[in-house]
A protein has these predicted regions:
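FIC/Doc superfamily catalytic core
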Residues: 1-203
Length: 203
């Protein structure tokens, strides 16, 4: 016990920003799921020093930078305890897709994934995969999702850590199943999951 007290008093643990490195790990793994080959060390250099890794594409670098900015925004928002809205989710998606999003012109109209616009076309899970919700049903589904999540946040027992984690996982699952955007759904819904965890004091 004396050794532990002396260790804490020394301030050694304050020399490392564990929260920053945890956040960089979340970002690196989330973009890796989407095909990024940038490592945690490379992201640290990119985020902190502006040094890009040799052999990594501009798209990969921008994907990681955008997600970092979205995480900073989302974690700050989580402290304000505001209700989830469609506009907030669109803002998250816009930040995630800021430099890698694209404008689309389809039968349903024009939309821009870099602006967080909800998709106006139908999408499937890969070529020949299962189709997601029809695009015409997406706006109501996202609004209903926000209503559900707000109700859950209000009533959950924050001392029940397992229940809080389950809620964050279910929020991710429900939103990614709706697949509101044409691209960036995985990154945005994982970010939402982490925002819920932040809001509930888990991370």
């Amino acid at each position: 016990l004396d050794v532990l007290e002396r260790y804490i008093a020394s301030g050694i643990e304050q020399q490392v920003d564990y929260e920053k490195f945890y956040l960089y790990s979340l970002i690196t793994h989330s973009t890796a799921i989407e095909g990024s080959t940038i490592t945690e060390v490379e992201n640290q250099l990119l985020f902190d020093e502006g040094i890009v890794a040799k052999g990594r594409s501009i798209n990969e670098q921008m994907m990681n930078v955008d997600l970092k900015n979205a995480y900073f925004y989302g974690f700050e928002w989580a402290q304000k305890m505001q209700p989830y809205t469609v506009d907030f989710l669109r803002q998250l998606s816009a930040m995630v897709m800021r430099r890698t999003g694209t404008k689309y012109s389809v039968i349903g109209g024009e939309f821009d994934s870099a602006q967080g616009d909800l998709r106006l076309c139908n999408v499937s899970a890969g070529v020949g995969g299962s189709s997601y919700l029809a695009f015409a049903k997406v706006p109501k589904a996202v609004a209903d999702f926000c209503e559900w999540l707000n109700a859950q946040i209000q009533t959950i027992n924050r001392n029940d850590v397992a229940a809080c984690y389950r809620l964050s996982f279910e929020a991710h699952f429900r939103l990614v199943t709706i697949h509101p955007w044409v691209d960036g759904n995985g990154r945005t819904t994982r970010l939402l999951m982490n925002i819920v965890q932040r809001q509930l004091g888990l991370i």
